């Protein structure tokens, strides 16, 4: 099974604008790595595609801010469906295992649209 943590965050500055809070939290270390600036440089150098909505926020502002990071997503376009999911790569990662985990993560999305 794949497990993720859920973390509730409450700002010290209760009156801070929601966009400032999201900006301070993005990208999360779980997505980008840490320290953030060097990690983002590596991602920009290695990844040859636009992440689109993947790893961005989906937020609702209804008297408060409710946001989630889009980890498993799909986007429709005229050319087809793009599925997004990822995993943490470390020095001990086994490439085939990482690939299989990613396939497992998007299997529910594929099933939802009957994609084979």
Where are the language model's segments positioned?
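Glycine-rich, small/acidic residue-mixed loop/short-helix segments
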Residues: 29-116
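Contiguous alpha-helical scaffold segments within structured protein domains
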Residues: 1-44, 114
